[in-house]
Amino acid sequence: MKSSDYILGYIISLLPIVLIQNILFFLTAIIMGLEFTISIIPTVLVSMIISIFFISLGILIGSLVNEKGTGGLGSIIVQLVCFTSGMYFPVEAIGGVFEIICKSLPFEACLTIIQGTLHNDFNNLTLIHTIVFLIYFIAVILLSIIVFKKRMISDNK
């Protein structure tokens, strides 16, 4: 089995879990006051695409470090995503170099894409958001395949 087959199989096997997680998330949000609109459906689909990026990032991390290091590194990545996506506060509030770094990472683009889809408001969504996300999306998938393949070869020696 090629490493790309293994990674693709792993991603595909997690998509039903991602779908269930999204449905439960939006049901909870509706119970807590989110108005049900038809835009929730495309938001779930967009979220699933973005989830593929994060699954691939997890595979990449798992291929780079041993099982003891993945927990700590995973926690650091989660906080990095939260701080650089604008999830806690708008990145424009800090501005400067921090804003430039955040806008060059895929996390702010992911949040903007999901928010725009959910609110049916694509005014803040630019081509740059899509390009930044796609570059990281493709790069992380390719890197995870390459690193996983090298890890498989080194483990078989």
Regions found by a protein language model. Give the residues of each.
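N-terminal hydrophobic signal/anchor transmembrane helix of membrane proteins
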Residues: P16-I20, H119, I146
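Transmembrane helix-loop junction
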Residues: A29-I30, I59-S63, G86, I100-K103, ...
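Transmembrane helix segments
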Residues: V65-S104, E108
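Short, membrane-exposed interhelical loops at transmembrane-helix boundaries
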Residues: L105-D121
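Junction motif at the cytosolic side of a transmembrane helix
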Residues: L118, V132-K157
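Transmembrane alpha-helix boundary/anchor motif
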Residues: I23, L27, S56, F89-G96, ...
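Alpha-helical transmembrane segments and their short interhelical loops
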Residues: S3, I7-G72, Q79, H129-T130, ...
